[in-house]
């Protein structure tokens, strides 16, 4: 068993400090001068229909230990023991990527068809051959981020309760991690990963490093309004309520945005999946959770 430690992407991008979300117009470096910045508005009209092979995913079904921390910008978690690291390949990716961390944005950073979702989770990965995110960021395509969008459900999602209980505990406790056992990453992924947008962009926090491969899944997972509100009560380093922590939309600037259309549509509040549905999933997107 190993543990993961959820970390805000700004730490990964190079120890940039002193920035806030209300002050986005003054973010320095590539945040102002870059031409391939993230997030962007996504829609069928700006994308090109594409066909990608299925993803191959390893290690996302394990029960793991995590340390959850409020770093003043997001909920963060980082792996403590770098063994049995979750990996992903296929899906049009150029190589094998290993999971570095997860973090959350409320509301969503990306929009789809002009709709902004209540929550977005980023799974930040680095190319395995580089051995770390710091090394991978020096190479275009060295870092791949997978975005999972959450949509509102009338009911709480019980799988999320343990993590949200920890986040509630650290809302006002900055940079002091709490430990949680039995965290399963795949519980935070859509059932069907066959549909997604793919484009080249940047980190969404300073210093906004470019050369990032983005995958934004089109199928969402449910979360209740009450559960989202737990994120919205987190505090910043200045003891200000962090009601929102998303970057404004950036210009596409002629970039090629690809869309693989999912044969199925799983939205928040979806009911049980029958045998025929599962058969179709595995015919179109073979995913291994081990």
Where are these regions (language model features)?
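Alpha-carbonic anhydrase
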Residues: 2-290
């Amino acid at each position: 068993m190993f543990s993961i430690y959820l970390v805000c992407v700004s730490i990964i991008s190079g120890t940039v400090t002193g920035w806030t979300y209300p002050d986005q117009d003054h973010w320095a470096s590539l945040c102002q001068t870059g031409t391939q910045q993230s997030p962007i508005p996504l829609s069928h009209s700006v994308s090109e229909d594409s066909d990608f092979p299925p993803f191959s995913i390893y290690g996302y079904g394990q029960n793991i230990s995590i340390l959850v921390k409020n770093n003043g910008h997001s909920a963060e978690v980082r792996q403590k023991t770098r063994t049995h690291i979750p990996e992903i390949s296929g899906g049009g990716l150029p190589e094998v990527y290993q999971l570095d961390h997860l973090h959350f944005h409320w509301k969503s950073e990306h929009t789809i068809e002009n709709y902004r979702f209540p929550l977005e989770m980023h799974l930040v990965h680095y190319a395995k051959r580089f051995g770390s995110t710091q090394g991978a960021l020096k190479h275009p395509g060295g870092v791949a981020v997978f975005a999972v969008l959450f949509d509102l459900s009338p009911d709480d999602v019980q799988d999320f309760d343990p993590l949200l209980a920890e986040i509630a505990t650290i809302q006002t406790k900055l940079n002091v991690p709490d430990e949680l056992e039995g965290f399963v990453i795949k519980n935070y992924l859509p059932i069907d990963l066959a549909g997604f947008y793919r484009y080249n962009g940047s980190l969404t926090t300073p210093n906004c490093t470019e050369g990032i491969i983005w995958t934004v899944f089109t199928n969402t997972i449910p979360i209740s309004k009450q559960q989202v509100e737990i994120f919205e009560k987190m505090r910043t380093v200045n003891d200000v309520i962090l009601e929102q922590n998303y970057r404004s939309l950036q210009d596409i600037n002629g970039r090629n945005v690809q869309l693989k259309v999912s044969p199925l549509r799983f939205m928040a509040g979806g009911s049980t999946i029958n045998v025929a549905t599962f058969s179709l999933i595995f015919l179109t997107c073979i995913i291994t959770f081990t």
